[in-house]
A protein has these predicted regions:
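Residues that flank catalytic or metal-binding motifs in active/ligand-binding sites
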Residues: 93, 113, 137
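A generic local structural motif
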Residues: 83-85, 104-105, 127-128
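Catalytic Cys-His active-site segments of thiol-dependent hydrolases/isopeptidases
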Residues: 108-130
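Glycine- and charge-enriched low-complexity intrinsically disordered segments
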Residues: 132-146
């Protein structure tokens, strides 16, 4: 699959509002459901796959990441070298970036090349931002088994 096809699917979610545990394009999605739904639409994940249930604030109160466990079931870890800017050489379109927001990994986004991440902002919905904004939070990268 070409990068432009991956990017096209990711961008169809742009502007969708944040809604906890929702996965409806144009209506509501959260940072966990977003990459899963993109992967389903691209044929990388089975249509019947369901994510685990999770509370909104679990990352604030735990030292382990529910998200990391979920990522390990669907994706392969991508070794990253160097800082957040130089590590983009290791990434491919559609890779999932795990960000440590509190005590553990608590937010996900998708890499779209050009040192940019698409993620679901709680107030602004699905947006594109420079990956450099998350230099301190970048914890790991993951790739769907395609």
């Amino acid at each position: 699959m070409e990068d432009k096809e991956i990017l096209a699917e990711i961008l169809t979610w742009k502007g969708t509002r944040w809604r906890h545990m929702q996965a409806v394009k144009g209506e509501g999605v959260d940072c966990v459901q977003f990459p899963v739904m993109v992967a389903k639409n691209l044929g990388w994940v089975s249509d019947d796959y369901k994510t685990i249930k999770y509370s909104r604030d679990w990352a604030t109160h735990n030292d382990f990441s529910v998200l990391t466990r979920e990522l390990e079931t669907l994706l392969e870890a991508v070794p990253l070298s160097g800082d957040v800017i130089s590590c983009t050489d290791d990434l491919r379109f559609g890779d999932v970036l795990a960000l440590k927001m509190e005590r553990c990994v608590g937010h996900l986004g998708m890499y779209i090349g050009n040192k940019q991440i698409v993620h679901v902002h709680i107030r602004r919905g699905v947006i594109i931002e420079p990956i450099s904004l998350y230099a301190k939070q970048l914890h790991s990268a993951w790739r769907f088994k395609r």
